[in-house]
């Protein structure tokens, strides 16, 4: 049985400023760098056959910091894929969370995106709302987002003989994957930077959620 251990990238300046951060990128803050080092130390006694991330710089940088804390990972294979990028908010990239959500939902009911998630909005619905509201039509639809993530997980599942895989990902990505493979929408906070979520992959390639949001430090 394979397992995919998912952690979120370190905190960035766009996180700090409460901006929607999809395909737009920003450097890790000092807190984010320190958090990545702490995650690396928390994983010190773990063995992974593959360490992966999205191709966005904040995720790749976090992956490199985590690996730097583990000398015994020197021979571990590294990879990254665009299929596991964060949700693309299109025109609303880097908007303040409150402003972007108000524009997409055409309502001021939800101060933050996570409030809509906790109120029951699925990623299918959220993606579709941003896509419909985008004056340029660039934002991903919900089905595009979910299909892309499934493609990314298929890539990891079918990657050689790797049994234990560490994925450095993104908040919406990890939450969406937990909903897809957990079989229901999770009315929870988005994953924090210090938490781990685990997927199981059985011998038939079926993926399921083992645990969500376990604090690591």
Model feature map: region roles:
Residues 35, 39, 59-62, 141, ...:
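Alpha-helical packing segments of well-folded alpha/beta enzyme cores
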Residues 108-144:
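Short glycine/proline- and acidic residue-enriched helix-loop micro-motifs
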Residues 1-48, 64, 204-217:
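An N-terminal RHG(E/S)-centered segment typical of histidine phosphatases
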Residues 53-54, 147, 168-169:
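Short beta-strand scaffold positions
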Residues 27, 72-81, 185-194:
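Short hydrophobic/aromatic-enriched beta-strand-loop microsegments
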Residues 40-115:
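Phosphate-coordination/substrate-recognition cap region in phosphate-metabolizing enzymes
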Residues 2, 68, 87-112, 154-164, ...:
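Acidic, low-complexity terminal tails and accessory targeting/binding regions
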């Amino acid at each position: 049985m394979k397992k995919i251990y998912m952690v979120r990238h370190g905190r960035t300046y766009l996180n700090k400023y409460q901006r929607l951060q999809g395909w737009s990128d920003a450097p890790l803050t000092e807190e984010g760098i320190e958090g990545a080092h702490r995650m690396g130390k928390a994983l010190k006694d773990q063995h992974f056959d593959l360490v992966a991330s999205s191709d966005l710089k904040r995720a790749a940088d976090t992956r490199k910091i985590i690996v730097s804390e583990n000398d015994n990972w020197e021979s571990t294979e590294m990879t990254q894929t665009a299929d596991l990028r964060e949700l693309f908010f299109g025109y609303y990239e880097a908007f303040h969370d409150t402003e972007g959500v108000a524009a997409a939902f055409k309502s001021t009911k939800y101060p933050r995106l996570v409030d809509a998630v906790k109120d029951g909005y699925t990623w299918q619905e959220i993606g579709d709302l941003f896509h419909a509201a985008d004056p340029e039509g660039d934002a991903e639809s919900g089905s595009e987002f979910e299909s892309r993530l499934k493609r990314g997980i298929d890539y990891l599942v079918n990657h050689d003989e790797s049994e234990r895989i560490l994925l450095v990902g993104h908040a919406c990505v990890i939450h969406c994957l937990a909903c897809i493979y957990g079989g229901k929408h999770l009315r929870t906070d988005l994953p924090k930077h210090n938490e781990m979520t685990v997927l199981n992959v059985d011998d038939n390639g079926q993926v399921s959620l083992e645990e969500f949001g376990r604090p690591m430090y």
